């Protein structure tokens, strides 16, 4: 039980970091597209 909990937490951290990275890339893409089109 105690050994599986840290592993699950690591997976959750990896997923959250991945989603934050995708969100950051999406925001940067929108900002760059607005900058170039304007």
Swiss-Prot record:
A GO CC annotation given for this chain: chloroplast thylakoid membrane
Pfam entry (one): PsbL
Highest taxon above the source species: Eukaryota
TM stretches of this protein: 17-37
Gene Ontology biological-process annotations: photosynthesis
Keywords: Chloroplast, Membrane, Photosynthesis, Photosystem II, Plastid, Reaction center, Thylakoid, Transmembrane, Transmembrane helix
Keyword Lipoprotein tagged: no
Family: Belongs to the PsbL family.
Role played: One of the components of the core complex of photosystem II (PSII). PSII is a light-driven water:plastoquinone oxidoreductase that uses light energy to abstract electrons from H(2)O, generating O(2) and a proton gradient subsequently used for ATP formation. It consists of a core antenna complex that captures photons, and an electron transfer chain that converts photonic excitation into a charge separation. This subunit is found at the monomer-monomer interface and is required for correct PSII assembly and/or dimerization.
Complexes and interactors: PSII is composed of 1 copy each of membrane proteins PsbA, PsbB, PsbC, PsbD, PsbE, PsbF, PsbH, PsbI, PsbJ, PsbK, PsbL, PsbM, PsbT, PsbX, PsbY, PsbZ, Psb30/Ycf12, at least 3 peripheral proteins of the oxygen-evolving complex and a large number of cofactors. It forms dimeric complexes.
Protein name: Photosystem II reaction center protein L
Organism, as annotated: Oenothera argillicola
């Amino acid at each position: 039980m105690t050994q599986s909990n840290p592993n699950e937490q690591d997976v959750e951290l990896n997923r959250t970091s991945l989603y934050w990275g995708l969100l950051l890339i999406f925001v940067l893409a929108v900002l760059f597209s607005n900058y170039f089109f304007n």
